[in-house]
C-alpha cells in the first residue's frame, strides 16, 4: 500500500510539474476592446481579402498538379497581384513529378541594406480537387494584404514574401514541396535569419461551445473549446517568435489569440510550410485557425469562399501587421 501511495504521489507531482512547465510555454492573450479600428481601412482590406479568396477558390478553383492548368492560372494571378501592389515577382521554378511548378516571391530589403531575414508565406495550392478557400486561399489573401500595407514601410529586416507551391499531398514533406525548396534557398544565402511565419488556414471561426478540438486530450485542459481564436504554433526552439507574435496580436488586434509551443515530434503541428524551416534549424511558426480541428469543410468540396469570416481574417491581418511593423 505504501508503494502505491508513493507511486501516486510521485505521479501527481510529475503531472503538476508538467502542467506548470507547459503553462510557461503557453502565450495566451486576452482579447482587447480598446483598440481603435479605422473603418475605411478595414473596409478596404476586407474587400481585398474577399476579392483574392474568390478569385483563387471560386473562379480558379482546385489548384494542384492534379488540376495543373488551374495551378498555372493561380500562379499567373499571383504574379499579377504582386506587380499591382508594387513588387517585382520572382519565380523559383523546378520540376515536381513531371510538372513545372513555381514558388512566387518578392523581397523587401531592409532600410539599412543589411539585417536579418524574415520569411512570411502561404501556400497557394489546394488539396486535389477541392476549392481550398480556407486551405489556403485565406492565407494567401492575408499575405497580399500585408504586402500592400508594408510596401512603403521602413523596416530594419529583410522581408521575403512567398506564395509556396505544393504544400499538399502528394508533395508535402518531400523535396517537391515549395517550402522545402525555399528553406534550402534561404539557408544557402548564409545570412542571419530571424524566422519564418506560415499563414495556414486563417479564415474559419466558430464561437459555439465544443466547436474546437485538439490532437491530444491534455490540450483540451489548457485551451478553449470554442473555435473563435487564432493560434500561433511553434516548436520549442521557436518560443521567442511565438511569444513576440502573440504579444503583437494583443497590442494590434482584438482577436482572441493562443500561442502554443509544442515538441516538434507532434505530427499535427508540422503539417505546413513552416516545417521545412524547422528542419533547417530556423525559428518558424504557423498562424492558423487549426484547420480540421475546427473546420468541417477542410479538404472537402465545401471549402468555399462564403464559409469564411472576413472580419476575423482582417483581425489576423492586423495582428501580423502589428508584428511586422515592429521589425
Predicted region positions:
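A non-catalytic alpha/beta surface segment that caps or lines the substrate-entry region
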Residues: 40, 54-109, 258-260
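Acidic/histidine-rich catalytic neighborhood of metal-dependent amide-processing enzymes
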Residues: 127-237, 266-269
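Second-shell loop/turn segments in exported
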Residues: 35-43, 60-69, 92-94, 126-136, ...
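Extracytoplasmic/secreted proteins, especially bacterial periplasmic and envelope-associated proteins
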Residues: 48-51, 55, 73-89, 138, ...
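N-terminal capping segment at the start of a domain
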Residues: 23-70, 85, 125, 293-303
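Hydrophobic membrane-insertion alpha-helices, especially the h-region
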Residues: 6-22
